[in-house]
Amino acid sequence: MGMIESLAGVQDSFGEVQFTDFGLSGPEAFTLSRAAATGGENQELALDFFREYGDGVLLDMLQEKRANLPALAAEDLFSGMLQSRLGKMIVKRAGLKYQTPLQSLNDEQLLACVKIAKWFTLAVEGVMGFDSAQVTAGGVSTREFDARTLESTISPGLFVCGEVLDIDGDCGGFNLQWAW
């Protein structure tokens, strides 16, 4: 599922996340994890489940669904658009009853669903820890090395690479590239 995440206004990323029994996972969750681990308390993550659509377009889509399927229950408002449980979560956050027929929903209620689907917030409670890590941060600061040669600017003749340096690249093999 494509979406964009924003971690406390600090970092944005576009790609896939997975909802699991322990929280979010997937490539974009990994990409944002360093900011989450070092960002302190009271962080919030915002997900946009319809990045490719503006609010008005998404509202038009929901209004059309209401017009074409008036007897459909509100819990199915996002059917065919999102995974069922996720659609229900949006409807619940909007304060709607699951069994309310779409014909009973006004534009303001549909707009509330749009706003939540386009800015779905979750509290960041932490990261899984070292045993679950795919990459670790820490090491010698890259500021202490020539970016072209990886020679130490403090100890000439000393060259380092890989995980000795404080680099945690994006998902997709970028950390492996540094390790070689």
PLM feature spans:
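A conserved FAD-binding loop/helix module that cradles the flavin
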Residues: 167-180
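Short strand-loop-helix active-site module centered on a catalytic nucleophile
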Residues: 13, 117, 179
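Residue-level detector of alpha-helical segments with a strong bias toward transmembrane helices
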Residues: 33-36, 148-149, 172-173
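An anion/pyrophosphate-binding glycine-rich loop and adjacent beta-alpha core
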Residues: 1-104
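A glycine-rich dinucleotide-binding beta-alpha-beta segment and adjacent secondary-structure elements
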Residues: 88-168
